[in-house]
């Protein structure tokens, strides 16, 4: 198994969308997966694109990916990367591919002068939790993740300041 890892290019977007749908199914979140090639292109390659990514290839087959974007810790005053997704297809798990992707993301962050990588893991995904802890990640047990989406976002955005 000779796996190469490189930056995602525009020609990879259909593969990334396919892998994202697989990932959503794995995480039991398929009903929320609305990504399209066009949306991904806008986020990654348009003039105001802000998402970066890596793809792992076994020959001509995309077998894993990672997506990330800039973030900022206000209390620490530090810029970092937010690891939005890292996903490895089932047949390629347990072959150090996750570790290779994570190391490459850390190198990218370091080369940009960034000092942290933040991410979330679903509570039930024990293999992922163990993976990140094994590599030295800190678990912030006292935090809860919230979001405004759909009607709640629209309502909030239409209220006067």
Where are these regions (language model features)?
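Conserved beta-strand in the GNAT
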Residues: 55, 61-70
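Conserved acetyl-CoA-binding loop-helix of GNAT-fold acetyltransferases
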Residues: 88, 94-107, 134
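C-terminal "cap" of GNAT-fold acetyltransferases
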Residues: 115-118, 122-161
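A short beta-loop-alpha structural element at the N-terminal edge
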Residues: 4-18
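A conserved beta-turn-beta hairpin within the catalytic core of GNAT-like acetyltransferases
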Residues: 72-83, 93, 140-141
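Conserved GNAT-fold acetyl-CoA-binding loop/helix
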Residues: 17-42
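A short helix-loop-beta-strand connector motif used in the catalytic cores of GNAT acetyltransferases and
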Residues: 43-55
């Amino acid at each position: 198994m000779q796996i190469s890892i490189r930056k995602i290019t525009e020609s990879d977007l259909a593969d990334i969308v396919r892998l994202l749908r697989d990932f959503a199914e794995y995480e039991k979140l398929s009903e929320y997966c609305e990504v399209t090639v066009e949306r991904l292109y806008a986020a990654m390659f348009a003039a105001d694109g802000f998402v970066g990514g890596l793809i792992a290839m076994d020959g001509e087959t995309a077998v894993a990916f990672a997506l990330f974007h800039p973030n900022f810790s206000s209390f620490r005053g530090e810029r970092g990367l937010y690891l939005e997704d890292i996903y490895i297809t089932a047949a390629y798990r347990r072959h150090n591919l996750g570790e290779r992707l994570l190391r490459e993301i850390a190198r990218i962050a370091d080369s940009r002068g960034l000092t942290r990588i933040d991410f979330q893991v679903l509570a039930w995904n024990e293999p992922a939790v163990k993976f990140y802890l094994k590599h030295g990640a800190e678990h912030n047990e006292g935090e809860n993740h919230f979001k405004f989406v759909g009607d709640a976002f629209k309502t909030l955005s239409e209220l006067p300041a």
